[in-house]
UniProtKB/Swiss-Prot annotation:
<dbReference type="GO" id="GO:0019843">
    <property type="term" value="F:rRNA binding"/>
</dbReference>
<keyword id="KW-0689">Ribosomal protein</keyword>
<comment type="subunit">
    <text>Part of the 30S ribosomal subunit. Contacts proteins S5 and S12.</text>
</comment>
<dbReference type="GO" id="GO:0003735">
    <property type="term" value="F:structural constituent of ribosome"/>
</dbReference>
<dbReference type="Pfam" id="PF00410">
    <property type="entry name" value="Ribosomal_S8"/>
</dbReference>
<dbReference type="InterPro" id="IPR035987">
    <property type="entry name" value="Ribosomal_uS8_sf"/>
</dbReference>
<dbReference type="GO" id="GO:0006412">
    <property type="term" value="P:translation"/>
</dbReference>
<comment type="similarity">
    <text>Belongs to the universal ribosomal protein uS8 family.</text>
</comment>
<protein>
    <recommendedName>
        <fullName>Small ribosomal subunit protein uS8</fullName>
    </recommendedName>
</protein>
<dbReference type="InterPro" id="IPR047863">
    <property type="entry name" value="Ribosomal_uS8_CS"/>
</dbReference>
<comment type="function">
    <text>One of the primary rRNA binding proteins, it binds directly to 16S rRNA central domain where it helps coordinate assembly of the platform of the 30S subunit.</text>
</comment>
<dbReference type="GO" id="GO:0005840">
    <property type="term" value="C:ribosome"/>
</dbReference>
<keyword id="KW-0699">rRNA-binding</keyword>
<dbReference type="GO" id="GO:1990904">
    <property type="term" value="C:ribonucleoprotein complex"/>
</dbReference>
<dbReference type="InterPro" id="IPR000630">
    <property type="entry name" value="Ribosomal_uS8"/>
</dbReference>
<keyword id="KW-0694">RNA-binding</keyword>
<keyword id="KW-0687">Ribonucleoprotein</keyword>
């Protein structure tokens, strides 16, 4: 069976693994998912990730991050742009997540970047998700 929204599947796996307090989660790999995982790593939401080749598309093994008493670093994930309703933002309309405490992941002509980078570079694009 084909998957209609692989990015939503990735975000759901992260959310479910985080709620169940798993150390690692496995996600089917793609270039876009690798870029999103890299943003999560740079922003400090995950410990790290490895790409495991399995002879097909590969697997991203992501190490989730928790605080001292196993409190969650990722408190919320929301998919914004969906296959049935794409959401785009102009460079002047890029959203702030929780007043700057969270990040918006945006797909632009310069690749997948955070809302802060998009504002700095003056580009708009498709708003993929909010993470806080």
């Amino acid at each position: 069976m084909t998957m209609t929204d692989p990015i939503a599947d990735m975000l759901t796996r992260i959310r479910n693994g985080n709620m169940a307090k798993h150390e690692t989660i496995d996600i089917p790999a793609s270039n876009m998912k690798k870029e999103i995982a890299n943003i999560l790593l740079e922003e400090g939401f995950i410990k790290g990730f490895d790409v495991i080749e399995d002879g097909k598309q590969g697997i991203i093994r992501m190490q989730l991050k928790y605080g001292k008493n196993k409190e969650k670093v990722i408190t919320g994930i929301k998919k914004i742009s969906k296959p049935g309703l794409r959401v785009y933002a102009k460079k002047d309309e890029i959203p702030r997540v929780l007043g700057g405490l969270g990040i918006a992941i945006i797909s632009t002509s310069r690749g997948i970047i955070t809302d802060k980078v998009a504002r700095k570079e003056g580009v708009g694009g498709e708003v993929i998700a909010y993470i806080w």
